[in-house]
């Protein structure tokens, strides 16, 4: 769908399984070379912009963080000409000042995960190394911060998201160590999404919706699924308010640095690219392969 208008993607995290504000909706069941995405994508119009929504864990919350097919999810969005992604996610706070139901917009990631298979589109004859020093789109992050403030929400612009495997929550030792390192929130899903979005030349920002204090705060009950889900409805409604405010403010044309992230990343000479890999990565390599 490279001839379609540049679109905006929303990845919904725990508690955010639909966006009722989308109009003229259509369902898209997409098969990718990496397997199926988490669920059908819902396309629709929001304030005159084409938007595609994907529930990260599937409708009904059926998929563990470790079971997510991140490549299929990002590939499916890119095949629909998505050039911006707002990734909404539930996180635990590692700092007193970040409270449940606050929003934190990370500026950095620290990857403590060990399950990195499938965190790149490349290989099979084509080598690429994207720059990831600044893993979040600054323009999109600032736009989300301004939008959250405008609708009256408590938002923190910047901070470090530390990623863990899960599905179990942190031990107290892990939580305290993360705090001592100066990390701000902890989650299980966003690092691979950000890496793959960068490879797909999509500008991504994470909207981290705080549900708990992890387990470092000994005077409170440690995080549990019940704790998290107790805040999800309120956080989902807050996220929708931000999305409705932010999406009309995203530029119509993709001309940010993230939209050219492969310019200096591709290492393998074009003449050596295997035909099968070119075909497989069509939506990602289209502007280099002429397809």
Enumerate the predicted regions with their spans.
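His/Asp/Glu-rich mid-to-C-terminal helical/loop segments that flank catalytic regions of hydrolases
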Residues: 215-263
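A short, charged, Gly/Pro-tolerant segment at domain boundaries
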Residues: 255-291
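Zn-dependent metallopeptidase/amidohydrolase metal-coordination segment
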Residues: 188-226
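Generic non-transmembrane alpha-helical segments
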Residues: 139, 143-154, 241-249
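Non-catalytic positions within long, well-ordered alpha-helices that form the structural scaffold/packing
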Residues: 78-81, 179, 198
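Active-site/ligand-binding-proximal alpha/beta "capping" segment
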Residues: 150-184, 260
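Metabolite-binding pocket within alpha/beta catalytic cores that recognizes anionic/polar moieties
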Residues: 1-133, 289-291
């Amino acid at each position: 769908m490279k001839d379609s208008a540049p679109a905006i993607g929303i990845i919904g995290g725990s508690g955010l399984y639909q966006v009722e504000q989308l109009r003229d909706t259509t369902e898209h069941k997409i098969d990718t070379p990496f397997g199926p995405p988490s669920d059908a994508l819902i396309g629709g119009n929001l304030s005159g912009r084409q938007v595609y929504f994907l529930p990260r864990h599937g409708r009904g919350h059926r998929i563990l963080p470790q079971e997510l097919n991140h490549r299929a999810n990002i590939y499916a969005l890119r095949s629909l000409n998505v050039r911006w992604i707002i990734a909404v996610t539930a996180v635990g706070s590692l700092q007193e000042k970040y409270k449940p139901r606050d929003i934190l917009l990370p500026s950095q990631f620290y990857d403590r995960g060990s399950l990195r298979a499938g965190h790149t589109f490349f290989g099979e004859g084509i080598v690429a190394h994207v720059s990831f020093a600044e893993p979040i789109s600054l323009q999109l992050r600032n736009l989300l911060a301004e939008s959250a403030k405008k609708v009256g929400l408590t938002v923190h612009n910047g901070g470090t998201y530390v990623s863990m495997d899960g599905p179990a929550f942190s031990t107290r030792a892990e939580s305290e160590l993360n705090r001592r390192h100066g990390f701000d929130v902890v989650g299980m899903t966003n690092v691979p999404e950000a890496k793959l979005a960068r490879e797909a030349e999509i500008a991504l920002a994470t909207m981290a919706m705080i549900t708990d204090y992890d387990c470092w705060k000994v005077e409170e009950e440690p995080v549990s699924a019940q704790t998290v889900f107790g805040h999800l409805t309120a956080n989902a409604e807050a996220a929708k308010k931000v999305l409705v405010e932010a999406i009309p403010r995203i530029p119509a044309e993709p001309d940010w640095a993230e939209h050219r992230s492969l310019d200096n990343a591709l290492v393998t000479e074009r003449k050596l690219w295997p035909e099968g890999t070119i075909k497989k990565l069509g939506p990602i390599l289209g502007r280099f392969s002429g397809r």
